[in-house]
């Protein structure tokens, strides 16, 4: 199987999000990279499902809560920005304060 660098990046991100979800299911609090991976995966998959940028900007704030992450992680995440592929092209999705 031959993957472009872009496809390799998406695959790695998807795996990182899956690993973070397994850790979360075991009751572990997520660190910064794990939280970003889950939020980013939510946005990429939402775009693939046909959701709008506006919908993802809102729903991206509901993916994780303060109880899901280690102390200090919400303060480290002011914004999460993801270039996602929508049916009508690639767009930048910004989720402000993704962990309220």
From Swiss-Prot:
Keywords: Cytoplasm, Hydrolase. Its EC number is 3.5.1.5. Pathway: Nitrogen metabolism; urea degradation; CO(2) and NH(3) from urea (urease route): step 1/1. It comes from the Bacteria. CDD domains: Urease_gamma. Pfam families: Urease_gamma (PF00547). NCBIfam families: PRK13241.1 (NF009712), urease_gam (TIGR00193). PANTHER family: UREASE (PTHR33569:SF1). Belongs to the urease gamma subunit family. Heterotrimer of UreA (gamma), UreB (beta) and UreC (alpha) subunits. Three heterotrimers associate to form the active enzyme. This is Urease subunit gamma. It comes from Mycolicibacterium gilvum (strain PYR-GCK) (Mycobacterium gilvum (strain PYR-GCK)).
